[in-house]
A protein has these predicted regions:
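N-terminal small/glycine-rich loop or linker at the start of catalytic domains
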Residues: 1-8, 58, 96-99, 138-163, ...
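Hydrophobic faces of well-ordered beta-strands that scaffold small-molecule active sites
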Residues: 3-7, 31-33, 57-60, 87-91, ...
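N-terminal beta1-alpha1-beta2 module of alpha/beta enzyme domains
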Residues: 1-59, 65, 164
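Short, acidic/polar
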Residues: 11-22, 75, 170-178
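An alpha-helical appendage that flanks or caps ligand/catalytic pockets
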Residues: 108-155, 197-262
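Active-site-adjacent beta->alpha loops and helix N-cap segments on the catalytic face
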Residues: 39-46, 192-207
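Conserved, mostly hydrophobic/aromatic
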Residues: 27, 48, 79, 121, ...
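Glycine-rich anion/phosphate-binding loops
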Residues: 65-78, 108
Length: 262
């Protein structure tokens, strides 16, 4: 078991980084750096790489719609270099409220895009000349979609590792199945052990059946909220706004997987 913590995307980062450095001394194993529509995660991850020595620095998460797969791979390789092999690339689809509302990009085919992103990232880290013909991504871009002058290039720098671990934030059945098949880790939101099998069990088993046996078993980062303080009701009151944000504010009214979890 590894112990991790998630930074707030709305708090003061310098103060949080100091706290993370102290938590590392106490035994913290992983720190998740969120992004949403706040400051970008990689800037904070690079800063944490300089302020820590041992713990894993994970993006939690970067949307696949806000960057090309190759830029995600380049960024993860850069943070991995700065941290001497301590980066974990956490990716996900986010949601249409952020992707279309903040980035102005159509929220289309999230499962397929994440699948192709994983495949492309691993090719980049192996420093292959990148030639990829997917449904959503094409490298080099063909003449009928671009100028036809694109070249198959490989990453200039040598990454610290042949692969940076990829963790996927997934909630829907198809996304969870794809994660269990391809990813190194799974980051579910509001994981409730007593209901996990009913919600995700079938998808996890279906994905595991297609998983490459040479790849290590899927690591599950099933964190729960922990409040430290006096009085049970007071701590519940502290948790209510965050839960209400996701249950009531994230996702459309008619299609909200967070609501299904609860």
């Amino acid at each position: 078991m590894r112990i991790s913590t998630l930074l707030s995307y709305a708090g003061g980062f310098r103060e949080a980084a100091e706290e993370v450095a102290e938590l590392e001394k106490a035994g913290l194993d992983v720190v998740w750096v969120p992004e949403a529509y706040s400051f970008d995660a990689p800037s904070a991850m690079g800063y944490l790489a300089a302020r820590t020595e041992r713990l894993t620095i994970a993006s939690g998460i970067m949307p696949v719609y806000s960057r090309t797969p190759t830029l995600l791979a380049m960024t993860a390789a850069g943070v991995d270099y700065l941290s001497d092999g301590r980066c974990m690339l956490g990716i996900g689809a986010s949601g249409p409220q952020v992707v279309e509302g903040f980035h102005g990009v159509p929220y289309q085919a999230p499962v397929g895009r994440i699948r192709e992103t994983i495949e492309i990232c691993r090719r980049v880290w192996r420093r292959e000349k990148l030639e990829y013909q997917g449904k959503y991504y094409e490298m080099p871009l063909s003449a009928n979609r671009g100028t036809g002058l694109g070249k198959a290039l490989k990453l200039i720098n040598h990454p610290v590792r042949d692969e940076v671990p990829i963790t996927v934030a997934a909630l829907g059945p198809k996304s969870v199945e794809m994660t269990a098949e391809l990813a190194d880790g799974w980051l579910p939101a509001f994981y409730l052990p007593e209901g996990a099998d009913a919600i995700w069990g079938e998808a996890l088993r279906a994905g595991a059946a297609k998983r490459d046996p040479a790849r290590a078993p899927l690591e599950v980062f099933s964190g729960g909220a922990v409040a430290i303080g006096e009085g049970l009701e007071a701590q519940r009151d502290r948790a209510r706004p965050q839960i209400a944000l996701y249950v009531g504010g994230m996702g459309a009214k008619e299609k909200n997987f967070y609501n299904r979890i609860f």
